[in-house]
């Protein structure tokens, strides 16, 4: 079989392409935690489609359910019509996810991607409250369309909008200044003081762990205080769980450990189970003031994704999957702490939570060098943070012990090689 010429992508695809530059090979096959390129080289996937493949590649049960559905001429496109797959998904999501957690949410299908759920959340918050402004947080990432981009912190991404991004006030995230300073004192002062110039917003939007902004994990007490502030001022709390949700931090929703109940929750990426496009927006029933068709979209009813998403929920029918994630999370955390201790040259700090972790290095350019070295050794992972200062571990939640150990070993080999060859960019 002839191999695809990389020149095809260089000549015909837009310069905006990104990941194919970081991982310069042509992939052709994937299974579980493994990927293969056209040359037959095997890679361990510690990237998981930026969080869209929490269950790994080509899960057997999801694949069978999808193939059977297609072979039976199951409906593919249906806008937001009532279909068998949608009904099954809604019922199972209620029974397996919402009811056991005592969560009473309506489910909205806003479109196929993460930015769609964020846009609908912002729109609904403004409609419900009659207010225009939103409070977002430093280093947050919420999407690439105008509304979600307006609450995103990254200056490079924001410049791409081409217009002023307005009606948003950015406040400091937990530990943005220092561990000793509670940034919510600052936020609350702005709300209390009529001379601050900050209007009471419609909503606050945040990630409990910032996936693109540096794997920054908010402390439990910080999240709990955010909820109290929102309740005090009648502000809706939106948790963007697009990347941190569906088990990535150790529980299905990333906010469960904090014991908070957001008014609105954004889910996408792995909610579809198989890597198929699907997004949902959850909100308290009393917020459901939409008129029929007031917010719509052609591809908001992906029946193929409903089929695989429903099958994926089987992982959560008891607590065994969650316990396995948390046990492996401890293994990963211990490994990262060991790396920082044994290789002081990298000036590292362990970041994140669960299967959403990494090491931030104070050595300029080091995180990028680690990902490049790891890729050459057969491991796929990316960087995070405003200066790409974090190398980020996002293994599939379904990875077995052998795969996890192999991947972690490659990371250590990569760091060791860089340290020994003095491949550190010294400041």
From Swiss-Prot:
Pathway assigned in UniProt: Amine and polyamine biosynthesis; ectoine biosynthesis; L-ectoine from L-aspartate 4-semialdehyde: step 1/3
Domain of life of the native organism: Bacteria
Protein keywords: Aminotransferase, Pyridoxal phosphate, Transferase
A GO biological-process term: ectoine biosynthetic process
Keyword Iron annotated: no
Cofactors demanded by this protein: pyridoxal 5'-phosphate
Keyword Lipoprotein: no
Protein family: Belongs to the class-III pyridoxal-phosphate-dependent aminotransferase family.
NCBIfam families from the UniProt entry: dat (TIGR00709), ectoine_ectB (TIGR02407), PRK09264.1 (NF006733)
Gene Ontology MF, one: diaminobutyrate-2-oxoglutarate transaminase activity
Pfam families on file: Aminotran_3
List of residues that carry N6-(pyridoxal phosphate)lysine: 269
Name assigned to this protein: Diaminobutyrate--2-oxoglutarate transaminase
EC number: 2.6.1.76
